[in-house]
Swiss-Prot record:
Its EC number is 5.4.99.-. It catalyses: a uridine in RNA = a pseudouridine in RNA. Belongs to the pseudouridine synthase RsuA family. This is Uncharacterized RNA pseudouridine synthase HP_1459. GO terms for molecular function: RNA binding; rRNA pseudouridine synthase activity. It comes from Helicobacter pylori (strain ATCC 700392 / 26695) (Campylobacter pylori). PROSITE patterns: PSI_RSU, S4. Coiled coil: none annotated.
């Protein structure tokens, strides 16, 4: 990351297992130094600075030529650069210095949760086209029926999958693969809650799936994308991948390159 500068809490969250809040606590406890001087909460780490945690040098990941952001997209934001209908887009919430970051897939306007963005086209493409698991918390109208469960277990093919889709969608039919997993958290006549895991990301796939059973989706939140969890990231906030997530991403990219080369 040539010419980079990061607040000390961002740097620690970026290159260690600690969250920003944990990083701030480490700074306040006097356990962090920049170039052998105690860091302050307002300290900024610049290129070639040496950062120490408990007297151990933090080594930025080798050959990391890209960055990945985790954004907790709120409802009412479009994953787009601009919108002709003047709806709010995600880039109005992100800092301007991230305007060149591209999103990994989409989350529709009415949905919230994990959205990954990167300054590397290769990373975006690899993550988008991989069959990584996506985990969602969903609230639907009415009961979870036996028919729904059968379809989640066995898959579903619809010639007319327009219910739950946008009115002007060009995608009319859709085939739904069996879900990787699901858990019924609450099953009630008024509304039900589920946790579902899929490894596809088709246009409004889950909304179309449940709409077929006349169960409108009331809430949809993506809580995990592959090896990246939403955890306690507040709505409308962003963070960098932490060290463990970057390690997993590097391993994923190396494997993707090997598969491509076969």
């Amino acid at each position: 990351m040539e010419g980079f500068s990061l607040r000390i809490n961002q740097f620690l969250a970026h290159y260690t297992k600690h969250s920003r809040r944990e990083a701030e606590k480490l700074v306040l406890e006097g356990r962090v130094k920049i170039n052998h001087e105690h860091a302050k909460l307002a300290s900024v780490v610049k290129e070639n600075d040496r950062v120490f945690l408990d007297k151990r040098l933090i080594k930025p990941l080798k050959n990391k030529k890209f960055s990945v952001l985790v954004y907790h997209k709120p409802k009412g934001e479009l994953v787009s650069k601009a919108d002709p209908l003047k709806r709010r887009v995600i880039y109005e919430s992100l800092e301007k210095k991230y305007a060149h970051f591209a999103p990994v897939g989409r989350l529709d306007f009415a949905s919230e949760g994990v959205l990954l963005l990167s300054d590397s086209k290769a990373v975006v493409s690899a993550l988008m086209h991989a069959d990584l698991e996506k985990e969602y918390l969903i609230k639907i109208q009415g009961f979870v029926t036996r028919e729904m469960e059968n379809a989640m277990q066995e898959g579903l093919k619809l010639e007319n999958a327009t219910k739950g889709a946008h009115q002007k969608t060009p995608i009319k039919s859709m085939e739904f693969a069996p879900f990787i997993g699901y858990e019924i958290i609450k099953n009630h006549a008024k509304y039900s809650k589920l946790r579902v895991i899929i490894n596809e990301g088709k246009n409004r796939e889950l909304r179309r799936f449940f709409a077929f059973f006349n169960a409108g989706v009331l809430d949809l939140r993506r809580v995990r994308y592959g090896f990246v969890n939403l955890n306690a990231l507040p709505v409308g906030k962003m963070r960098f991948l932490n060290r463990q997530e970057y390690n997993e991403l590097h391993a994923f990219m190396a494997n993707a390159a090997n598969v491509k080369g076969d």
